Amino acid sequence: MESFLRGDYHVHSTFSDDAVSTIAENLAAASAAGLTTIRLIDHVRASTEWVPEFLAAVAAEPVPAGLTVLTGVETKIMDAAGTLDLPPDLVVGPGGLDAIVIADHQFPGDTGPWSPTTAREKLDAGLPVAEALDLLIDGYIGAMRSVSAGQLAHAFSILPKVGLSEDDLSAEQLERWAAAVAETGTLVEANEKWACPSPRVLQAVITAGGTIVAATDSHIASDIGRYTEVQALLRAVVPGKVVGA
C-alpha cells in the first residue's frame, strides 16, 4: 500500500476557482511528500477557454527529480447518455491533456443534469431507486466510452446528496459499471476528500480487472499526498490492480 500512496491523481490549482495553491506550490508539495506521480487537474465546463494556458503553465514549471507530472481536466456528467460538460476543442493525447476526469457533480437525468434537490424530489415523487441508479450507471458508462483516456473522480459521491448510498446499487448494476471501467481502461480514484467509493465498489473494480489510483482531491498544497480515508478504504479491499502496489 505504501507505494500506492506515493501517487496523487487529483490535485487542483488556482486555475480552479475554489483552489488556493499554484502549480509550482503543488509540485513542490508533491516532491516534499515523496510522491512519484501527480495529476494536476482543474474544473472545466463547455465555455472554458483557458486549457491551453493551463497546459503551458504546467509545461513551464521545472519537474522535481523523481516526480512524474500528468494533466487532466475535471468535468461533470450531464445526462444518462454520458454527455460531458467539456470545451469542444480539447486535445487529449500528445500535445494536449493526459486524461479527462469524469465527475458526478450532479445527477445525470434522462434529459439533462439534475441537482441533488431535483433528484430527491423525483425519488420522493415515485421514481424507483433502481431506475434512478440505472440512469447514473448509464451516464457513467456513456461518459467513459466517450473519451480516449478517462479517470473517475470520487465515484458515486452524488448518492448521499440525493438520499441514497452505494449499498443501493444492485450486484448487476455494479458489475455492469465495473465491466465498463475495465473495458475502457478508465482509472478509478480512491478519493480522500469524499472517502469514496466504498470497499465494495473498489473490490468490483479489481474483480473486473480495472485499475485504482489514490487521489486527495486537494485544493491546497498542504493536503497533497496525505491519506487517511484512502488507507481505510484500501485495507478492506482484497489486494489487486492498484497503481503502485
Language-model segments: residues:
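An N-terminally biased module of ancient metal coordination in phosphate/nucleic-acid-related enzymes
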Residues: 1-85, 155-179, 196, 207, ...
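Short, charged, surface-exposed secondary-structure boundary motifs
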Residues: 110-112, 222-226
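Extended substrate/RNA-proximal surfaces in nucleic-acid metabolism proteins
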Residues: 51-183, 235-238
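His/Asp/Glu-enriched short active-site or ligand-binding loop at hydrolase and phosphoryl-transfer sites
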Residues: 184-189, 194, 215
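Mid-to-C-terminal alpha-helical segments outside catalytic/metal-binding sites
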Residues: 211, 226-245
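Hydrophobic residues within beta-strands of alpha/beta enzymes
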Residues: 38-40, 100, 152, 188
